[in-house]
Amino acid sequence: MPKYRSATTTHGRNMAGARALWRATGMTDSDFGKPIIAVVNSFTQFVPGHVHLRDLGKLVAEQIEASGGVAKEFNTIAVDDGIAMGHGGMLYSLPSRELIADSVEYMVNAHCADAMVCISNCDKITPGMLMASLRLNIPVIFVSGGPMEAGKTKLSDKIIKLDLVDAMIQGADPKVSDDQSNQVERSACPTCGSCSGMFTANSMNCLTEALGLSQPGNGSLLATHADRKQLFLNAGKRIVELTKRYYEQNDESALPRNIASKAAFENAMTLDIAMGGSTNTVLHLLAAAQEAEIDFTMSDIDKLSRKVPQLCKVAPSTQKYHMEDVHRAGGVLGILGELDRAGLLNRNVKNVLGLTLPQTLEQYDITVTQDEAVKKMFRAGPAGIRTTQAFSQDCRWDSLDDDRAAGCIRSLEYAYSKDGGLAVLYGNFAENGCIVKTAGVDDSILKFTGPAKVYESQDEAVEAILGGKVVEGDVVVIRYEGPKGGPGMQEMLYPTSFLKSMGLGKACALITDGRFSGGTSGLSIGHVSPEAASGGTIALIEDGDTIAIDIPNRSIQLQLSEAEIAARREAQEARGDKAWTPKNRQRQVSFALRAYASLATSADKGAVRDKSKLGG
């Protein structure tokens, strides 16, 4: 029978000092012996996805204590990728994932907490907490802050839906008036919550449902809606049950590594492909799998991407649907229900509610459930009122979107495409693979060949795009922006958005060893591995080289002979200490970022730290 971890600090005469300090936090004699549960919050006023989380930790804590546990709350950092985008701040985004994971480990292990409730929401916070949860392997439940309502405004006498990406594109489009750009900017992000499309934050919060670590509705129920409060209340109650099951009944099925199994990871990736999630999710699932000691690699993702269709299409791949529409169509369980009927899921998995996948679908799939409360929950909709307050409205759609032929979520028969929303490409300068969000690629450019325009930084590429130096048919290559080379693997949302601003969204390709925002669409290929700074062939591409992209056949090729590539590699090595570094880039890199770069692996490994360098 496992012993409560917290007993290390609460039992025995020699722990009198620790108990004295616990008493100073408000604990009493009756609390010693109860499970101590960490409420891992991430409130900050810097991030709209987290600005409303201040009081939500207290909600969870109250339920923990009412259910027989002791709750102790702390916060992690949280970086807003959108605000950090397009300048040196983006160097810090991906490294913050590792800091978040480590900080959770530090706090939980230093204080011997028995379990956790993770209150996350945005891009690196959910992955960081997920990595920590699987590393620590103590009972955990995730409950996120929820999606933002979609922006809405009237342009040319037509009401349109908006999000952050629209503001970025119109702000750089010389054909758009100042008044219209200002109108879009003011309308794009109307409420608290994670950005309203299927960007990285919402993708990851959906995937925690598929992994079994969060409750139904977690990925799609709006941050502003009153119904979301119940997820927090339930999490506080349920975590005490899970904790007691493990420590008092020796039930290891309550542990995250047994819930988020290899089968669950495959289901999560299947969901990701079917819903056209952010390419960043690939990076984060690979990293989380390593923490769980699960053999889940790019090869597994490649195999899944070849058989899973696209059943859901959401912004940025279309402006017709946002997360509020996904929720109305049944949310994550709506998509999983269609995948299950298509025979594409592993059914022998459970979630934090203790339900198997078939049991969960029977209760929460809107096309089969008889539970009116569930149907009511999925009718939770937007209010269209600017606010930073959680649970501030109770608006509902008049009806559910259960049209699987022409609605937001489709059945296999009516899939948006037989190929899924993400694909892994391989070739002679992406030997270990690269990722493209096919959901956002126009059919006309699924095969694309063109001359390379090579840039050693995102900044240089942006200047060239806005300066008219990139023209129709070009393949923009941005290198030395990988985990090590950046360092930090910057997102390339500005270059892709500015290509659209210049009318080149369907006329050019962009390839990088960096990564893309979940808000990116177009022929944008990232995560090229090995990266340039690790000796990747992407470092050998020169202006004018022909690059051939063939998404249907999962191929990407630099059209040079092996002899020419070998000669260029020899010339690169001859640079000595300067080999595999950018030639003319001026960039200030802090000690903290240099420390990150010294251990960073390429994207095909999840950009995690290279344990072999630490002897581990």
UniProtKB/Swiss-Prot annotation:
Transmembrane segments: none annotated. One of its GO terms (biological process) is L-valine biosynthetic process. Its cofactor is [2Fe-2S] cluster; Mg(2+). PROSITE patterns: ILVD_EDD_1 (PS00886), ILVD_EDD_2 (PS00887). The active site is at 517 (proton acceptor). Mg(2+) binds at residues 81, 123-124, 491. It catalyses: (2R)-2,3-dihydroxy-3-methylbutanoate = 3-methyl-2-oxobutanoate + H2O; (2R,3R)-2,3-dihydroxy-3-methylpentanoate = (S)-3-methyl-2-oxopentanoate + H2O. Pathway: Amino-acid biosynthesis; L-isoleucine biosynthesis; L-isoleucine from 2-oxobutanoate: step 3/4; Amino-acid biosynthesis; L-valine biosynthesis; L-valine from pyruvate: step 3/4. InterPro entries: Dihydro-acid_dehy_C, DihydroxyA_deHydtase, DiOHA_6PGluconate_deHydtase_CS, ILV_EDD_C, ILV_EDD_N, IlvD/EDD_N. One of its GO terms (molecular function) is 2 iron, 2 sulfur cluster binding. [2Fe-2S] cluster binds at residues 122, 195. Keywords: 2Fe-2S, Amino-acid biosynthesis, Branched-chain amino acid biosynthesis, Iron, Iron-sulfur, Lyase, Magnesium, Metal-binding. Binds 1 [2Fe-2S] cluster per subunit. This cluster acts as a Lewis acid cofactor. Its EC number is 4.2.1.9. The modification N6-carboxylysine is found at residue 124. GO terms for cellular component: cytosol. Functions in the biosynthesis of branched-chain amino acids. Catalyzes the dehydration of (2R,3R)-2,3-dihydroxy-3-methylpentanoate (2,3-dihydroxy-3-methylvalerate) into 2-oxo-3-methylpentanoate (2-oxo-3-methylvalerate) and of (2R)-2,3-dihydroxy-3-methylbutanoate (2,3-dihydroxyisovalerate) into 2-oxo-3-methylbutanoate (2-oxoisovalerate), the penultimate precursor to L-isoleucine and L-valine, respectively. Belongs to the IlvD/Edd family. This is Dihydroxy-acid dehydratase.
